[in-house]
């Protein structure tokens, strides 16, 4: 296992955090807990062997590191943890960094040594392929092939699972589809400006201009709003461009495979320079939130709820209901239009699904797969917990009124959000609209709101599936520094107004061209070896 490179280099695939964050030593396992980690890794990870279902030992304890897609403290994670332990008889320890810092803290945890690694983690995109390449993840291929879920007849996501295989092996399990982002526009703002939903980039830019210079919120003041906001000019994970698709269009800031089967770095192409020019022009005109560079997703959502801007590219499906509910709770008009992709964008991108992965230091990976991951889709009480939460905390069937809506005895409904009072929950970790296994007893099927269905339909009918980028030794070595440099170049051009020619001269002088070509060569070498 090549984890020694991680320990020495701090796991370059973590995309080189731009700020220092504290690690997770307080939740670390003791050294004795992983004394046999190397032996376990060699026997299970390298061979892909897995025990039969009836031979799997139930773990006494499972430690997981997760982001805020899993129940947070504010949403009574303690109640979730207690219920999970009641259902399994297993002690569950949850390590949960701030959502926007998750991959940074995870990288620091990996770099601190296998004795500190959790048993299971949530990964996505290049983080998944990178950690797999480094030997940090357990090969769960046979565990999945031998699982009760696969043979149950209920599983419908074979294409999703197959898309996550690396050289035919599965190192992480997706429990839902990947989903993606759709551009939402406040209808009232369009109406106030006398506009219709844009279908081209020129119309889109004209809308941003009107939302910035006019009076779209109808408060009688021109110019006290702006067009859009985003959590950075480039995402924190693949597909990188999903928060600003109208500006990127056909450009891509990282590695992709052409129709000819040859890998290339999209950052070095002319169409990426054109995308930078579009972003810089819109930013200079004031159409884009001046805090975009440092925004987190929560910052953007709060500004949207406060009616500071009118165009927000965010997740399809249940997030349409979340956005609507929060606008209403802030006293603003809540009707949103999910746009079809403008002509120059063509299609939205469905990201590769986030996965649950088991680290190679885990002493009982088969047990963790069975009792933690596979059980999430059991079509029963555990799936209920991961989808809707805890009864009488996050959902209920009692006769009551929630936010002015009366429910009868026995009628399933979601409770008022603990984190965002004035709104109702829509889901927990599992999104029922992205399900990859049938669940006949799903009590919340009828509770999915029309706006969520509409947004998901717009996305599903106008998206393409992203594919994972394989990792190589060169990718693991250079891509962290390369992405840091790329983000710096983008910030210089868009925010500081640096000329594109000067910015790309720095890209070459600071090593970007060399790193990029080295990675491209390694990807094409790997491709030709298939």
Residue ranges and their predicted role:
Residues 54-55, 139-156, 196, 250-270, ...:
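Short, solvent-exposed loop/beta-turn-alpha elements that line the ligand-binding surface or hinge
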Residues 8-10, 25-203, 255, 263-267, ...:
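Conserved N-terminal structural module of periplasmic/extracytoplasmic solute-binding proteins
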Residues 67, 370-491, 497:
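Conserved small-residue motifs centered on glycine
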Residues 18-23:
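C-terminal motif of bacterial Sec signal peptides marking the signal peptidase cleavage site
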Residues 58-62, 88-92, 113-119, 136, ...:
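Loop/turn elements at helix/coil->beta-strand transitions in domains of secreted/extracellular proteins
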Residues 165-238, 255-299, 303, 358-370, ...:
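Helix-loop-helix "hinge/cap" segment bordering the ligand-binding cleft or interdomain interface
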Residues 5-16:
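Sec-dependent N-terminal signal peptides
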């Amino acid at each position: 296992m090549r984890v020694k490179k991680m320990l020495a280099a701090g796991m370059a695939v973590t995309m080189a955090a731009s700020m220092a964050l504290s690690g997770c030593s307080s939740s670390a396992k003791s050294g004795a807990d992983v004394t046999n980690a190397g032996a376990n890794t060699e026997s299970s990870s390298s061979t892909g062997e897995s025990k039969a279902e009836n031979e799997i030992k139930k773990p006494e304890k499972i430690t997981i590191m997760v982001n805020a897609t899993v129940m947070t403290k504010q949403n009574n994670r303690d109640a979730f943890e207690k219920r999970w332990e009641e259902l399994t008889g297993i002690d569950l320890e949850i390590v949960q960094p701030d959502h926007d810092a998750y991959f940074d803290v995870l990288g620091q945890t990996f770099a601190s040594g296998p004795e500190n690694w959790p048993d299971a983690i949530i990964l996505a995109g290049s983080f998944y392929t990178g950690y797999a390449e480094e030997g940090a993840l357990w090969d769960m291929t046979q565990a999945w092939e031998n699982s009760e879920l696969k043979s149950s007849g209920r599983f419908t996501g074979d294409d999703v699972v197959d898309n996550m295989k690396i050289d035919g092996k599965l190192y992480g399990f997706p429990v839902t589809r990947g989903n993606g982002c759709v551009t939402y526009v406040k209808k009232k703002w369009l109406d106030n400006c006398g506009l219709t939903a844009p279908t081209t980039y020129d119309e889109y830019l004209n809308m941003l201009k009107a939302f910035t210079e006019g009076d779209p919120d109808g408060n009688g003041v021109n110019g006290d709003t702006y067009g859009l906001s985003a959590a950075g000019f480039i995402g924190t994970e693949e597909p990188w461009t999903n928060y600003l698709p109208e500006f990127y269009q056909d450009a891509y800031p990282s590695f992709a495979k052409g129709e000819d089967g040859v890998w290339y770095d999209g950052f070095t192409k002319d169409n990426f320079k054109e995308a930078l020019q579009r972003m810089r022009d819109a930013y200079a005109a004031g159409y884009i939130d001046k805090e975009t560079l440092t925004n987190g997703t929560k910052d953007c959502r709060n500004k949207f709820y406060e009616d500071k801007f009118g165009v927000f590219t965010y997740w399809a499906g249940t997030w349409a209901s979340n956005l609507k509910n929060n606008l209403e709770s802030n006293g603003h008009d809540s009707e949103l239009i999910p746009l079809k992709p403008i002509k120059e964008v063509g299609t939205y991108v469905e990201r590769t699904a986030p996965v649950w992965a088991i680290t190679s230091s885990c002493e009982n990976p088969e047990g963790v797969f069975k009792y933690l991951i596979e059980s999430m889709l059991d079509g029963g009480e555990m799936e209920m917990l991961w989808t809707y939460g805890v009864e009488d905390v996050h959902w209920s069937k009692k006769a009551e009124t929630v936010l002015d809506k009366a429910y009868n005895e026995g009628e399933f409904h979601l409770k008022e959000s603990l984190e965002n009072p004035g709104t109702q929950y829509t889901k927990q970790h599992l999104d029922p609209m992205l399900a990859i296994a049938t669940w006949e007893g799903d009590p919340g099927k009828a509770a999915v709101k029309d706006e969520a269905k509409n947004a998901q339909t717009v996305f599903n009918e106008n998206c393409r599936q992203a594919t994972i980028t394989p990792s190589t030794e060169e990718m693991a070595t250079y891509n962290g520094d390369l992405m840091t440099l790329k983000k710096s170049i983008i910030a210089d051009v868009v925010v500081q107004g640096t000329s594109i020619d000067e910015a790309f001269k720095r890209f070459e002088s600071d090593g970007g061209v060399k790193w990029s070509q080295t990675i491209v060569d390694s990807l094409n070498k790997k491709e030709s070896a298939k």
